[in-house]
Regions:
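Conserved MFS/SLC helix-loop-helix module at the cytosolic interface between two early adjacent transmembrane helices
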Residues: 61-100
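Cytoplasmic helix-loop-helix junction between adjacent transmembrane helices
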Residues: 105-143
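Small-residue (Gly/Pro/Ala) motifs that create kinks and tight helix-helix packing interfaces
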Residues: 34, 146-155
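Short hydrophobic/alpha-helical segments at membrane-entry points of transmembrane helices
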Residues: 16, 98-106
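Extracellular/periplasmic helix-loop-helix junction of adjacent transmembrane segments
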Residues: 33-60
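Residue-level signature of mid-helix packing/kink "hotspots" within the transmembrane helices
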Residues: 28, 56-64, 147-148
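Pair of pore-lining "gating" transmembrane helices in MFS-fold secondary transporters
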Residues: 8-32
Length: 157
C-alpha cells in the first residue's frame, strides 16, 4: 500500500474507532441510568433486570446474525444506520415513562450496537492493507474507553 492509501486507510480506521467510542458510550448510558429509571418509574428489581436483559439480548445475541449477513452481503450503510438506531433509542429513553417504552428504547440502542459492530469490524479489516491485527487493534481501542469514561464521570458528579 502506498503512502497516500495508507493515510486514507488510517483516516478511515480512526473514524471507525471514534464511532466505536460513541457507540459504546451510548450503550453505557443504560446501566448508568438504571437507578434513575427505577426511581422515576417505580420499577421493581425484576423490571430493571428485564431492561438489562433486553439490551444484552439485542446487542450481544443479535450481533452474530448481523455479522453472518454482513459477511455475505457487505452493508457499509450499516455503520451510520447502527449509530442512528442507538441515537434514536437514547432519545426515546430520555422521554420514556412506561416499562414498554423503556424496553423499546433500550432494544433500539442494543440493535444499533448489534448492527454497528460487525460491519465496522469488517470495514477495519478491509482497509487494513494486510495489517489486520493493527487495524483491529485501532478499532478496539475506540470502544475501550467509553464505559470506563462514563463510570469515572459518574464518580465525579
Amino acid at each position: 500500500m502506498d503512502s497516500k492509501n495508507q493515510t486514507a486507510a488510517m483516516g478511515i480506521l480512526l473514524t471507525i474507532s471514534a464511532a466505536h467510542f460513541l457507540n459504546d458510550l451510548l450503550q453505557s448510558v443504560i446501566p448508568a441510568s438504571l437507578p434513575v429509571l427505577k426511581e422515576a418509574n417505580a420499577l421493581t428489581f425484576a423490571e430493571v433486570g428485564l431492561i438489562t436483559l433486553t439490551v444484552q439480548i439485542t446487542s450481544s445475541l443479535l450481533q452474530p446474525f448481523v455479522g453472518a449477513v454482513s459477511d455475505r452481503h457487505p452493508m457499509p450503510a450499516a455503520l451510520p444506520c447502527g449509530m442512528l438506531l442507538s441515537g434514536l433509542g437514547l432519545i426515546l429513553l430520555a422521554h420514556a415513562t412506561t416499562l414498554p417504552a423503556i424496553l423499546i428504547s433500550v432494544a433500539l440502542i442494543g440493535c444499533g450496537s448489534a448492527v454497528f459492530h460487525p460491519e465496522s469490524s469488517r470495514t477495519a479489516q478491509d482497509v487494513s492493507g494486510g495489517r489486520r491485527g493493527f487495524a483491529q487493534a485501532v478499532f478496539q481501542v475506540g470502544g475501550m474507553p467509553a464505559p470506563r469514561w462514563d463510570r469515572s464521570r459518574r464518580r465525579l458528579s
